[in-house]
Amino acid sequence: MKKLKINYLFIGILALLLAVALWPSIPWFGKADNRIAAIQARGELRVSTIHTPLTYNEINGKPFGLDYELAKQFADYLGVKLKVTVRQNISQLFDDLDNGNADLLAAGLVYNSERVKNYQPGPTYYSVSQQLVYKVSQYRPRTLGNLTAEQLTVAPGHVVVNDLQTLKDTKFPELSWKVDDKKGSAELMEDVIEGKLDYTIADSVAISLFQRVHPELAVALDITDEQPVTWFSPLDGDNTLSAALLDFFNEMNEDGTLARIEEKYLGHGDDFDYVDTRTFLRAVDAVLPQLKPLFEKYAEEIDWRLLAAIAYQESHWDAQATSPTGVRGMMMLTKNTAQSLGITDRTDAEQSISGGVRYLQDMMSKVPESVPENERIWFALAAYNMGYAHMLDARALTAKTKGNPDSWADVKQCLPLLSQKPYYSKLTYGYARGHEAYAYVENIRKYQISLVGYLQEKEKQATEAAMQLAQDYPAVSPTELGKEKFPFLSFLSQSSSNYLTHSPSLLFSRKGSEEKQN
C-alpha cells in the first residue's frame, strides 16, 4: 500500500482540466441540469458504499471510516447533508450509478480501464494490490496456472475478475474461478481460514487488516501491481462534480487533512509478523482475562484496550518483567518514575498499571495544544518511551526538515534521525533512540488493532451461538439472548478526547442495504 497522495488519473483529463480552468464561471446554482446545482438544490449528497473495515462502518449508530470521513467533509464542502446508502457488494454500487440513485461511489474502489469506460473517476488517494490468499496450514500455490473454480472464489463485481480473464486468455488457459454472488471479500477470507474455501483474492489493505485478527491467513502471491483507489460518479458529460472533487482533494492535500486521515486509517503499517501476532492473540486468551479488570479500572480517559496494548508492548503482560536498564513491572517503570508516582512495588500489577496511566496522562498534558486532539496520544506515547524532551527535539527537527511538527505522520518519520549524529548533534537534548520510539508506537497500534478485532470476533461468535441456541429452543427469545451490545470498534467511533487508536480493525461484513442520513 502506498501513501495517500493526489494522483490525477482521469480518463477524460482534457475535459476535466477545462472544467478546472473554467471553475470560477461554472454556474452551479443557475443551471437545472448542472450536477452540482442539482445536488445543492436537493440539499444532500447521495453516496453509495459497502461495509468494510476501512471504508464505512458504524458503532452505536455512529458512522466512521476513511471513505465516510472524506465523503462527509466533501458534503460539508458543498454545503449539503450526506446521505449514505450501504450496499451488499460492488455490483450493487455501480447499479446505483446506472439507476441514478447515487451521485458518488466512495467504497475503496480500484481505478481500471474497464470501469472508466462507463464511469467518471475522481482523484486517487491511496493504492492497493490484489493478492491471492490461503490458510497457513494448507498448500501454498506458486502460480495461478492450475487453480480451478472448485478452489478459487472471488466476490461479485471484484476488479480482479478482469485481470483473471486476461491471465486466462494470455498465460493460464486452464485457470478457472467462481464468483459468489452472496459474499464479499471479508466473508470469503473467513471461509478460507475456516477451511470452507481453498483460495480467494482481496486487496492488500483488507488483507493486512484481516491478518491482525486472523494471522493464519497468508498471502500466496500478488495478482496485480499497485492499483490506485478512487471514487466514481456518472459519466455523462457534466464535469462540475469532477471539478468540485478535484478542488476539494487539492485543498485537503494542501492543508494536511489527507495526510492526517492517512495516518488515522492507514498508519498501522503493513509489515505483518505471523509469529508475533499469533503469540499476542494466545496471550489475549490465556493472560488478559485476569488483567482486564485492572485495565478497565485505571484506563480513565483512554480506551482500556489501548492501555492493554501499551502494557503488552512494555512487558508482554508480565508483572515480574525486568530490563537490563533497570525498568521493571507490567508498565516497565524506572525506579525514579515509580517513586515520583508513589509506587512502592513496581512488580505489583495494579500499582504498575495505575502508575503507568498517571505517567502517560502527564505526558498527554504536556503535548502542545497545536497538535490535533486525535493525534496527541501518539506524541504522548513517544514521550513515554524516550522522554518528553526528546519528543520536543523530534518536533523541532520535523520543522527544520520542512515537515509539520503537529502532524504525527511527519514527526514519526524524523524519530529515527534522533540517533544519527548529523542530526542529534544540532538538537537541544542530543542523542535519543528514536528508532525504538517509532517501533514502540507502531507496535502498540498494531496490538490494539488485533485486540479490538479479536475481541469483537469472539463477541460475534458468542452472539451467533446464542441465536443458534434460541433457534434450537424457540421458547427462548433470540432478542433476549443476543441483546447485549458489543463494542463494534468503539476505539474508532468514540470522540477523539478519549485518545483512542486511529487505525481501523476488521469488521465482519453486513448484508443487505441500508440508508443513513448525516
Curated annotation (Swiss-Prot):
Q: Name one Pfam family in it.
A: SLT
Instruction: Enumerate the catalysed reactions.
Output: Exolytic cleavage of the (1->4)-beta-glycosidic linkage between N-acetylmuramic acid (MurNAc) and N-acetylglucosamine (GlcNAc) residues in peptidoglycan, from either the reducing or the non-reducing ends of the peptidoglycan chains, with concomitant formation of a 1,6-anhydrobond in the MurNAc residue
Q: How does it sit in the membrane?
A: Peripheral membrane protein
Family annotation (PANTHER family):
MEMBRANE-BOUND LYTIC MUREIN TRANSGLYCOSYLASE F (PTHR35936:SF32)
Which SUPFAM superfamilies is this protein grouped with?
Lysozyme-like (SSF53955), Periplasmic binding protein-like II (SSF53850)
Q: What is known of its domains?
A: The N-terminal domain does not have lytic activity and probably modulates enzymatic activity. The C-terminal domain is the catalytic active domain.
LT domain: annotated segments: 270-518
Family affiliation = In the N-terminal section; belongs to the bacterial solute-binding protein 3 family. In the C-terminal section; belongs to the transglycosylase Slt family.
Q: Which domain of life is it from?
A: Bacteria
Query: What is the designated name of this protein?
Result: Membrane-bound lytic murein transglycosylase F
GO terms classed as biological process: cell wall macromolecule catabolic process; cell wall organization; peptidoglycan catabolic process
The positions flagged as active site in the entry are: E314
